[in-house]
Amino acid sequence: MVHWLADKGKLKLDENVANIWPEFGVNGKDQIKVNHILNHTSGLHNALAGVTEDPKLFCDWDECLKRIAMAAPETEPGRQLIYHYLSYGWLCGGIIEHVSGKKFQDILEESIVRPLNVEGELYIGIPPGVESRLATLAIDADDPSRLAPKAHPGIPSSLTLTSISNLIALLNILDGRRAIVPGGNGHFSARALARYYATLVDGGVIPPRHPSSSLPSLGSHPHHPMNKKDENQNQNQNKEDTTDEVETTIFVNPKAKIHDAFLGTGDYKNLTLPNGVFGLGFSRCRTAGGSLFGFGHAGLGGSTAYCDINNRFAIAVTLNKLCEGALTGEIIRFICSQLDLPVPLKYVGST
């Protein structure tokens, strides 16, 4: 969504966040730029670290934005890449709202949900009536400790087994599912998430509708089930549209420039740490030999999605029984072997 706004000329990726979000420019954050946040180098990796212990705060979007605007960085911006875990979503969310003048969820609908026709299958904070279609998150009971993050300089100190357990509990309660937590409670079907990456792999060109054999048809679920007007509009949108008003792309700039922005390459190479795990908003996919071939992002407990730029391939794996990712690796290796595609280094030989 930040890239969508940048593509429209609403912000620059090397712009100071405080120019966009004045309240943010305090406590040593006046030199933090948008690219520092997208590259996980802003120093705010532990901001709001105790939020999973405070359900009321966790579910209060506006209060979380206020508090993160007051946070102080722990490292100099642009110097050290440390994964921003939950703080990333509030940081990007604040930028999105201040740049656009609109609410986060309105931009989500405008930039992704409606153009891609994934109504009812892609949410960050669910509306009333969707909860009956959601899976319950569970930890692999065989060895829950395997979910604990491995010690690594790029992992924040606040990301612990306790914080993960607290987060899972919050995401299984209704208030937690209705909250806007972009860094933690995206609710997606695998096909909606794969469609999103299929759009990105082609530089924003929206793929054709899914075949009729894919049931229920994509976009057929009521997006706001308790809103009858919305449900009727959703049904009308799913009828074959032959007008010239149908969107064909979500970006204006050429595909190569869009991909460079995602990966932090080309004109954007100075906005990221060299050879870092992350580009600008996405993790970089490399082969075992080190060749860069795509981008994506893994989620908690094995869920993941990525795309292969060279082969125009996108995949999403969504799990509700959370484990350390061995099953995900098996799925990805099998599919890549069948299609003769490179396997991301993260999943090469994972067990």
Predicted regions: what they are:
Residues 80, 85, 97-115, 123, ...:
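Catalytic loop of the DD-peptidase/beta-lactamase superfamily, centered on the K-T-G motif
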Residues 16, 121-123:
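Residues at or immediately flanking beta-strands
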